[in-house]
Amino acid sequence: MAKAKFQRTKPHVNIGTIGHVDHGKTTLTAAITKVLHDKFPDLNETKAFDQIDNAPEERQRGITINIAHVEYQTDKRHYAHVDAPGHADYIKNMITGAAQMDGAILVVAATDGPMPQTREHVLLARQVGVPYILVALNKADAVDDEELLELVEMEVRELLAAQEFDEDAPVVRVSALKALEGDAKWVASVEELMNAVDESIPDPVRETDKPFLMPVEDVFTITGRGTVVTGRVERGVINVNEEVEIVGIRPSTTKTTVTGVEMFRKLLDQGQAGDNVGLLLRGVKREDVERGQVVTKPGTTTPHTEFEGQVYILSKDEGGRHTPFFNNYRPQFYFRTTDVTGVVTLPEGTEMVMPGDNTNISVKLIQPVAMDEGLRFAIREGGRTVGAGRVTKIIK
């Protein structure tokens, strides 16, 4: 059968399955691919449980994560779905942003109700900015007592509300295993779940619709034309003759105008999110710009030196530190394209952080960095990655 062409016509949405180990995240992922394949055979491939469970290793910011990616389509949307089988993999994925989610399906076994990892996953989803969560109450075939199902549903709603997620989110009773076996009643439950995903997870804001930002990777001079900065456009669109600001690393912000946009040595009218471009800047000297700064739409990005972050510290086996660190630890924080040294303050009551831990820290950088909440970073010691994190709150 011919492969269905990737149509740009449908909105593309990134989702994932989260929840306690053994509650059926991977089985549900497999069931979704099978049910959608049977419903729309020309749009979807079916993926067996073991294809998803033996998730390939990926490296993100120097950290190895096991994570499975599957794709599928409904009538309305094209989905990229991630499933991190292990608890540690889930935590690492959320913090490093190996796979960002526009929404998540929280899988809770009706037989157990919310468990410690269920809570931890929802908390982490809040901290890393997952916009929406809905619920698959799995293994519902194994619970005959309607009151018990309602009780579990209530507990899950309280858990969502506690982390400021929508407590009226859809909670769909499913049996992933029975759906995989082709049981008509439970196949219908997975179809109902996917309808709920279509309806409840909001369309993501496309990167091109956000204000322009490009991290500077390189700076050079073209004789007779001026200074060019190169990098990959992170978000937004830049047109020739638009004003920009150069932000970060230095104490003051520089204003200038983009007089040319080049890509693959060709002149363009504009560059957009995802493009690797060179920007010609009017009246800017070679020494006025450096790697680590960002070129951005005026007034949309500010430099900061103090922030709070959620971090994952690599274990010794992952190539991380062999020893814990304490208050006033001074590593480098790698933001986008450059390292900046910072001083770490641990949360009250935390004496030290062990390799393999995830925790909140406060950081004071020695140079300002253009940042927003949600920006990701690596923690390095002399170029070696020892951790990864995400800005959860800007202090100054």
Swiss-Prot record:
Region feature (G2): 62-66
Span list, region G5: 175-177
Reactions that this protein is recorded to catalyse: GTP + H2O = GDP + phosphate + H(+)
A molecular function (GO) term: GTPase activity
Domain tr-type G span(s) in chain numbering: 10-205
The keyword GTP-binding appears for this protein: yes
InterPro entries in alphabetical order: EF-Tu_GTP-bd, EF-Tu_GTPase, EFTu-like_2, EFTU_2, G_TR_CS, P-loop_NTPase, Small_GTP-bd, T_Tr_GTP-bd_dom
Keywords associated with the record: Cytoplasm, Elongation factor, GTP-binding, Hydrolase, Magnesium, Metal-binding, Nucleotide-binding, Protein biosynthesis
Residues binding GTP, per UniProt: 19-26, 83-87, 138-141
Positions of the UniProt region annotated as G1: 19-26
Record-level GO cellular component terms: cytosol; extracellular region; peptidoglycan-based cell wall; plasma membrane
Region (G3): 83-86
List of residues binding Mg(2+): 26
Subcellular localization: Cytoplasm
GTP-binding as UniProt keyword: yes
Family annotation (Pfam families): GTP_EFTU, GTP_EFTU_D2, GTP_EFTU_D3
Sequence segments annotated as region (G4): 138-141
EC number(s) reported in the record: 3.6.5.3
BP GO terms, sorted: response to hypoxia; response to iron ion; translational elongation
Top-level taxon of origin: Bacteria
Family that this chain belongs to: Belongs to the TRAFAC class translation factor GTPase superfamily. Classic translation factor GTPase family. EF-Tu/EF-1A subfamily.
Role noted for this protein: GTP hydrolase that promotes the GTP-dependent binding of aminoacyl-tRNA to the A-site of ribosomes during protein biosynthesis.
Subunit structure: Monomer.
Protein name in the entry: Elongation factor Tu
Organism this protein belongs to: Mycobacterium tuberculosis (strain ATCC 25618 / H37Rv)
Higher taxonomy: Bacteria, Bacillati, Actinomycetota, Actinomycetes, Mycobacteriales
